[in-house]
Amino acid sequence: MSLNQILSLKKGEGKFLLIAVLFIFSLFASYSLLRPIREALGISGGTGELKWLFLGTFIATIVGSILAMILSGMIKRKLYTDFIYGFFALNLIGFFALLHQISQGSEAYSIVARSFYIWVSVFNIFVISTAWSLLADVFSKERSARLFGIISAGASLGGIFGAFFVSVLSKFIDVPSFIFISIICLGISIVLKNLLIK
């Protein structure tokens, strides 16, 4: 039995599926690299601030969700995804630069750390949800029924990879370096996204 038969692939679908799996893997790897960093930075100013961070995250999530719905209805899908991914990639570069330059323990560092904690939740709303919407658009209903299980496995593996990477290397790599690796993963997913919707 061939691989195409095992995966229920029709002629010409193998390459397209591979791109989709690598796209979602890279994206979830990027996000899962940020989550442990988010938690570490969130408590860097003390656990007493967590309730305010939770409140800020709650408000940012509501505002972000509303904004995402408005923008997705106003902008064409390709332009919307290009804008969202480009915007958040620039955000990550900004956080990387700030956390690399500002001395840890300073008030400025605490402000950036708290902002990053809330920002990661907004990243999840826009970038992750947009990815699934994009895949739903480029895959027909029939293709989705056959192939989304495989793509979902790619997302799970990406999440596991990112979390494992942080757990293994956290003693050797600083926070800005993990953010830089996340930027690379996001950049790879942007390239693959363009291959999906070209």
Give each language-model segment a name.
Residues S2-A60:
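Helix-loop boundary and gating motifs at the non-cytosolic
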Residues F25, A29, E107-V127:
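Hydrophobic core of transmembrane alpha-helices in multi-pass small-molecule transporters
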Residues K51-V63, A145-S167:
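Glycine-rich segments within core transmembrane alpha-helices of 12-TM secondary carriers
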Residues G64-L79, F164-K171:
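Helix-to-loop junctions at the C-terminal end of transmembrane segments
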Residues G73-A89, F172-S177:
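Cytoplasmic membrane-interface "Motif A"-like loop-to-helix N-cap segments
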Residues G86-L92, P176-L195:
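Symmetry-related core transmembrane helices of the 12-TM Major Facilitator Superfamily/SLC fold
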Residues N124-S140:
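Intracellular juxtamembrane helix-capping segments at the cytosolic ends
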